[in-house]
Amino acid sequence: RKHNISMHLEDDLLMANMDARLIIQVLVNLINNAIKYTPENSNISLNARRVEDKILIEVQDDGNGVLHPDQLFEMFYTENNHSGDTRRGMGLGLSLCKSIVLAHGGKIWVENVKPHGACFKFVLDAVEVKLYE
């Protein structure tokens, strides 16, 4: 499947106390879901920026959006709005993402984007780094 994936990172150095392997797994899962739930040639973007004392990371797509955002992170919950991908998940990926983000003291949620699409967001505590001391 072909998709247009873009990434926008804030110019500043973004640092957080985290297990990088686990947070990468969260990102991989969110991007894989965006690919699975959007038609071919859709746009998917990964954005990261600082918001006050947090780092906000977003994975946004221009697919059909989310039918039940309040249930999406529950274990074994799946939605039936695949766009051309017939693989059916077990409903564990987003639940695992939530567990990982919560274990890091963060928060994860999803918002529908008008006119179409979904934006998965999570925040982690930012860490101040002084490079020239």
Enumerate the predicted regions with their spans:
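Conserved catalytic submotifs in the C-terminal HATPase_c
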Residues: 4-14
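Short helix-loop "hinge" at the ATP-lid/N-box region of the Bergerat-fold HATPase_c
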Residues: 34-35
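Short conserved segment of the HATPase_c
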Residues: 66-77
